[in-house]
UniProtKB/Swiss-Prot annotation:
Changing D333A: Small decrease of sialyltransferase activity. The lineage of its organism: Eukaryota, Metazoa, Chordata, Craniata, Vertebrata. It is a single-pass type II membrane protein. GO terms for cellular component: extracellular region; Golgi apparatus; Golgi cisterna membrane; Golgi medial cisterna; Golgi membrane; Golgi trans cisterna. Changing C181A: Loss of sialyltransferase activity and aberrant subcellular location. Expressed in hepatocytes (at protein level). Strongly expressed in liver, spleen, lung, kidney and submaxillary gland and weakly in heart and brain. Pfam families: Glyco_transf_29 (PF00777). Residues 63-403 are annotated as: Catalytic (soluble form). The gene is St6gal1. This is Beta-galactoside alpha-2,6-sialyltransferase 1. PANTHER family: BETA-GALACTOSIDE ALPHA-2,6-SIALYLTRANSFERASE, BETA-GALACTOSIDE ALPHA-2,6-SIALYLTRANSFERASE 1. The chain crosses the membrane at residues 10-26.
């Protein structure tokens, strides 16, 4: 009897123990499930995670905190800005270029011109290597480079020998002012550029010497507002008096004088004696505007190029290209210059209309072209991408600047 009662008590104890164990296991499973569901509630789906990782601004979660009022975890976060992808760099003209870029042949030519000093240059101004901001240099050019033409009141052009030959209308009243202007170089890199339409969309277009537009309109356009020519072309070009190329737009001829010579002294000894050809042209085309640039202007510009350049530059006048840029800066609010600074199409072919090869056409030999390009690159307000793709530099004109 006693043995039977003990057996029943033992069985009841086992039953209670098993029941307690089952209840504990069930409760633990419920807690685990609740925790799993809670974790899932705050888990970012993989698709959303990928979107967030690819966005410019990512949300980064830190340790969760408990709200004392409600037993709900609060996730604190802060924003992390992703690194901006760097802009692509373009290999374009370096505004700090020096003669170290020249090949041995051009370096020898430079030394020869320094020794020759044909124009008796004796520069006594500041520099070399004076640093200007873009704004200060623009003001410096405006205030010290006088773009003006020979007038009938200038001796000896006021004598009977010249009566009736010079244009009656003042140059500044004949041209401009314009908003957007284009200066189109004659560089071989303009070939296959497809820039013609863009160039023609400007209010005025300046071209140089005998650079044609016929058969090249797709690359260089067809509009010609001003044509700047050197005295060598006017004197030696046999077609000058007959070719219709030289009857379109306003013509300007320039001839270098001895360093800072006045008009009478220059007239006695011009670099090229173009005066008789000029008179012949005016007799044939009396209504064609044809101006003569005062000889002081190129040397006023040369002084500034030397002032800001780290090296001694050739003691020769600036190129027609640089003169044309300054002329248009006096007449226009904005000047777009094409292939003065070379693009990705850079070539040793000198002209888009001729097959003549020489690296001097890009780097300079007679003219201080390398340092002219340095100055234009410094003044450029466009992008390196524009230079690389289109050979296009954009400069502000002088008319609206405050100095």
């Amino acid at each position: 009897m006693i043995h039977t009662n003990l057996k029943k008590k033992f069985s009841l104890f086992i039953l209670v123990f098993l029941l307690f164990a089952v209840i504990c296991v069930w409760k633990k499973g419920s807690d685990y499930e609740a925790l799993t569901l809670q974790a899932k509630e705050f888990q970012m789906p993989k698709s959303q995670e990928k979107v967030a990782m690819g966005s410019a601004s990512q949300v980064v979660f830190s340790n969760s905190k408990q709200d004392p009022k409600e037993d709900i975890p609060i996730l604190s976060y802060h924003r992390v800005t992703a690194k901006v992808k760097p802009q692509p760099s373009f290999q374009v003209w370096d505004k700090d270029s020096t003669y170290s870029k020249l090949n041995p042949r051009l370096l020898k030519i430079w030394r020869n011109y320094l020794n020759m000093n044909k124009y008796k240059v004796s520069y006594k101004g500041p520099g070399p290597g004076v640093k200007f901001s873009v704004e200060a240099l623009r003001c410096h050019l405006r205030d010290h480079v006088n773009v003006s033409m020979i007038e009938a009141t200038d001796f000896p052009f006021n004598t009977t020998e010249w009566e009736g030959y010079l244009p009656k209308e003042n140059f500044r009243t004949k041209v401009g002012p314009w908003q957007r202007c284009a200066v189109v170089s004659s560089a071989g890199s303009l070939k296959n550029s497809q820039l013609g339409r863009e160039i023609d969309n400007h209010d005025a277009v300046l071209r140089f010497n005998g650079a044609p537009t016929d058969n090249f309109q797709q690359d260089v356009g067809s509009k010609t507002t001003i044509r700047l020519m050197n005295s060598q072309l006017v004197t030696t070009e046999k077609r000058f008096l007959k070719d219709s190329l030289y009857t379109e737009g306003i013509l300007i001829v320039w001839d270098p004088s001895v360093y800072h010579a006045d008009i009478p002294k220059w007239y006695q000894k011009p670099d090229y004696n173009f005066f008789e050809t000029y008179k012949s042209y005016r007799r044939l085309n009396p209504s064609q505007p044809f101006y003569i640039l005062k000889p002081q202007m190129p040397w006023e510009l040369w002084d500034i190029i030397q002032e800001i350049s780290a090296d001694l530059i050739q003691p020769n006048p600036p190129s027609s290209g640089m003169l044309g840029i300054i002329i248009m800066m006096t007449l226009c609010d904005q000047v777009d210059i094409y292939e003065f600074l070379p693009s990705k199409r850079k070539t040793d072919v000198c002209y888009y209309h001729q097959k003549f090869f020489d690296s001097a056409c890009t780097m300079g030999a007679y003219h201080p072209l390398l340092f002219e390009k340095n100055m234009v690159k410094h003044l450029n307000e466009g992008t390196d991408e524009d230079i690389y793709l289109f050979g296009k530099a954009t400069l502000s004109g002088f008319r609206n600047i405050r100095c």
